[in-house]
Swiss-Prot record:
Cofactor binding annotation: Binds 1 heme b (iron(II)-protoporphyrin IX) group per subunit. Binds 2 calcium ions per subunit.
Keywords attached to this entry: Calcium, Heme, Hydrogen peroxide, Iron, Metal-binding, Oxidoreductase, Peroxidase, Secreted
Catalytic reactions on record: 2 a phenolic donor + H2O2 = 2 a phenolic radical donor + 2 H2O
A single GO molecular function term of this UniProt record: metal ion binding
Similarity remark: Belongs to the peroxidase family. Classical plant (class III) peroxidase subfamily.
Disulfide bonds: none
Broad EC category: oxidoreductase
Protein's name according to its UniProt entry: Peroxidase 4
GO BP term, example: hydrogen peroxide catabolic process
Cofactor: heme b; Ca(2+)
Known EC number: 1.11.1.7
Length: 9
């Protein structure tokens, strides 16, 4: 799970 991806999108 990429928590970072959530912010990036």
């Amino acid at each position: 799970v990429h928590y970072h991806d959530c912010f990036v999108r």
